Amino acid sequence: MKRFISIIAIVFFTMVPSGYSLKKTDYRDARLKNVCKDLKGDALLYFIFIDSRTTTPWTEFDIQSTIDSVRMAINWLHTQARKNNISLNIISDFFIGEEFTTITKNLPSGTVTESITQPNMKKGTVLINTWADGIARIAGNSLPIKEKEGLPEIKNPRNKERLVAYLRDENNVESVALFFMVNNYYKTDISVQMNTMNTEDVEFAIVSYKYPSEIAHNLLHLYGAADMYRTIFRDNTKKIRFLESEFPDEIMQDPYGKNIWTLEISSYTKYLIGWENEIDYRYESYLTD
């Protein structure tokens, strides 16, 4: 159950979605971008349970407890929004087959960590996106398609972009946060967010743990929030230490196993998710890594 937080040497200073260069990562590049522009209004958290060769099989108990954690995470997010006078209504839904059957699809390179970093970050990103499209196609094939008079025949979603578009229209929401849930509760791996700093494909997250804090943490990622601890997305030790001392109870610190009700959303994160229009000048240099 120990959380994997060590940095992979090949990562250098790049973000997964940002074009694979050695330039500094600027977390503002994920602000107000793509499908999950800002965490306001009506939003859908849609999650799909995935079994793979290297993860623990999902049981009915695991699935039910994850659904409970999602509800708690959403409750916490609604509480934070009310405290900040933000209009926010998150609903949740999930894909599951009959008798709690999941989608079985092996990760490209075994674990989440290996899949995103092997053989390198650029190739790993391509493979992860292809993997996610394959899952979206399986889920999309089971969705009911309503015929609309006078309109061309609508086909079932065949990739994650079309799946998100379908879910957005069907649920009449402004944004869709797409989660692929893998069961690493008793294993050592990471969660990861994809496509948050570009508009070439829709955002999604692969989430390894079912803690409410982990779920809220990764949902905020899709709306532009940045890690404050050492991950494959942040490596500057000096900045990590400052953010830890400045925001010790921030949800974007390592969320593993933490009681979500002891955590908060700092002004730093509020800026990145669109809850505030400006950020204190003292924190501007910490928006890069």
Regions found by a protein language model. Give the residues of each.
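Hydrophobic h-region of N-terminal signal peptides that target proteins for export
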Residues: 5-18
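Propeptide-to-catalytic entry region of secreted or membrane-anchored zinc metalloproteases
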Residues: 22-170
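Loop/turn elements at helix/coil->beta-strand transitions in domains of secreted/extracellular proteins
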Residues: 42-46, 172-178, 200-203, 248
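Solvent-exposed loop/turn segments at secondary-structure junctions
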Residues: 52-55, 183-188, 209-213, 257-259
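Auxiliary, metal-adjacent structural segments of Zn-dependent hydrolase domains
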Residues: 151-196
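Short pre-active-site segment immediately N-terminal to the catalytic Zn-binding motif
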Residues: 198-216
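Active-site recognition of the HExxH zinc-binding catalytic motif
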Residues: 212-228
